[in-house]
Amino acid sequence: MAKAKVKKDQSPCSGSLGKTANTPKQKRKQKQRKFWQNHPKITTKTGETKKVSLLLPPKGPQEFSSNWKALQELLKPKENQALPATTLAKCPKKDQKVSEKKTEESVPQKSGHKINGGITSVSAIAKGAKAPSQATPTKAAEKSDEVSKGKKRKIMAEATDTEHQGKKPQGEAQPQPPKVDIWFDDVDPDDIEAALGPEAGRVAREMQGITDTRSPTVDKILVKERAFEGLTRTVAMDCEMVGVGMDGEESILARVSIVNLFGKCVYDKYVKPTERVTDYRTAVSGIRPEDVKKGEPFKVVQKEVSEILRGRTLVGHAVHNDLKILFLDHPKKAIRDTQKYKPFKQKVKSGRPSLKLLCEKILNVKVQTGEHCSVQDAQAAMRLYTMEKKSWEVAIKAKYTGVMPVDRKSKGPQKDKQCPQ
């Protein structure tokens, strides 16, 4: 007998295993299909950008104007770029995402418009592609609405910040005039003028409420413009003193100023008082307590002045008082004192003429009308010297060398005339 073939049981498990092996791939494919069905924009964008690059140049005037408008919109800075980094950092990311979604939804997705034979979609135009003139006003209106909303948010945020910090008046927001830029606390306007120029000194005096005793005509007469500003072989010095002691009659040094032959200030420093000051003599000296507090030590100033005067001709008015207060000595041959010069005494008709009188009669300039300035006094003494320099030097040479000055008319020594000191 033939053996009957035993049929293998086709269990449901065997069939199910084959099907389950393909299920992950099928699921992936289904997910991909669903993804591309739900997101058709990505495929259209890639194709549309390629089409935009193949656009031909405009032929008609209408197309040219519309493309020009589209190009202007392209060149406009984007909202995110226009906003500063601080404002972008303050805005939360959620608000930015919401605004991006609104912009995408606001632009309708149409099939496209024909431009020079090519087809472009509205989404491509929103990205920066060239669009006809009909679509531009609507986009501009939408953008302006979005920008206005963003500005309103910024204004509200700034208003809340100001409320937390404290309300400030609107007048402070206005830009202040440039005069405030050259305001310095506890700084003498003369120092500001020496460092920054006469205009800065004038503004500083106005801000501090100090009347400027020096007029522009005085500076023009006493100082030579566009001249050498360094040390010369001839210098003029003047000092200001303050009172010490019980009655304030004794004097100590408070300020030293030195100018060159052309009236340019080369040295000007305040000196710290070595004793307790009882009388600052502000009405005459122009010295105030805050000036000498930040001054230099006396020994430092004394050393610096002695180095400047060494080997140079010294000009001044009653210079012996200035040298005495500095505890310095200078050879008489190198001193030119405007108070002791005899031709000046004869012109003014005074045995001990003041510097103010000499300037009024000889230079036709008014100085020392209010508070004294050591720089101006030194400049005035130097100007008086330069006017009589030739005759003065001839007289000094005759005095110390024994050679009498020769009169050009008589061509002989002037025996009768005395040499001025």
Curated annotation (Swiss-Prot):
MF GO annotations: 3'-5' exonuclease activity; exonuclease activity; nucleic acid binding
Record-linked CDD domains: REX4_like (cd06144)
Compartment annotation: Nucleus
Compositionally biased spans, kind Basic and acidic residues: 92-107, 140-149, 161-170
InterPro entries from the UniProt entry: Exonuclease_RNaseT/DNA_pol3, REX4_DEDDh_dom, REXO1/3/4-like, RNaseH-like_sf, RNaseH_sf
GO biological process, one term: rRNA processing
Statement: the UniProt record of this protein carries the keyword Ion transport: no
Protein name (database record): RNA exonuclease 4
Source lineage: Eukaryota, Metazoa, Chordata, Craniata, Vertebrata
